[in-house]
């Protein structure tokens, strides 16, 4: 009995605060006055009401910095997605043609259809694929620890953590960070925009960003309180340390205006965008900076080689042997070289600066000229004889000592053509033939 009394006193002095029953006896009146707080007894009028937008497709697509970005929708079931798709179609038809709002609506429609396809497909068919904000995330099987999550900026431990990589922009992140991503895939920007910022570090100041990161809107300042502000040399904007890792990249504006290829610090988003744009021929140097050809001799040489290759192209298209040998495929990495002579990619400028492109293009030019002038009889038969001096050597429009008539494309020796620039024998012959065939056309 003495032991039981001690045990009771101990329990009364050491009550468990998490024990809803309590060690002490409750008065019956208290239990009646305070009914148990069960969820089933709560009045329906006390439940907060959540007002949804009128249209399903408007969920999460408002245009302020703190809303969900385009492509992230609250609609999660198939019925809501189908309704949102129909509403988006109707909006596209109602908006002005080729307007920015109509383009945004088309992008939203693409997002909705991709999400609907992801829900319709069985999980067993593509268990390793996740589609989010135009990212196509595939589950990685690498166990290496050399990767860093682009979202949380921590190491990815491949042995114990599941992680994904976007096939479009190489964005890597943990599986737990996928739903936290707010930045769309930059490949969509490359597809729609496909142009560079051509102003050198167009800084506007932290006040224009409301002292927040240009990407994630985290508060930043130059004094590193609460977070350090890092400037991107490409966009001129400021970013937090999670969005700016001090990556280095060549800035297109500095290369075009100053012929400067020194890598500068850029944000993660700018680095991925510049990497995707590196091989795209979007720079028309003669319009952006025509004086560059007066100061960079390598550019003049490359332009002459490209012009010669364009003159050789008709020979290869009509030559069976050249088509079988696939000579033009030697330029498959730079397809724009066989289409025009004035468009350049940033990779072209880098290779011109280092001297690699000049050597490569000279070798290809030599191979092409050898086929036309020596190896192929059909191509040799398409050569020209100078009608001004009547010498027997065969001329081609890409020869360095020749000139081409702008009207009839006849080829002459350069000296002969300039000495008789007032008259072209072939043009005169064609004009006389035309008058003979159409005598009624004469005045």
Curated annotation (Swiss-Prot):
Residues 1-49 are annotated as: Disordered. Keywords: Metal-binding, Repeat, Zinc, Zinc-finger. Pfam families: C1_1, RH_dom. GO terms for molecular function: zinc ion binding. A zinc finger (Phorbol-ester/DAG-type) spans 134-185, 364-424. It comes from the Eukaryota. InterPro entries: C1-like_sf, DEF8, DEF8_C1, Multihaem_cyt_sf, PE/DAG-bd, RH_dom. GO terms for biological process: lysosome localization; positive regulation of bone resorption; positive regulation of ruffle assembly. Belongs to the DEF8 family. Positively regulates lysosome peripheral distribution and ruffled border formation in osteoclasts. Involved in bone resorption. This is Differentially expressed in FDCP 8 homolog A. The lineage of its organism: Eukaryota, Metazoa, Chordata, Craniata, Vertebrata.
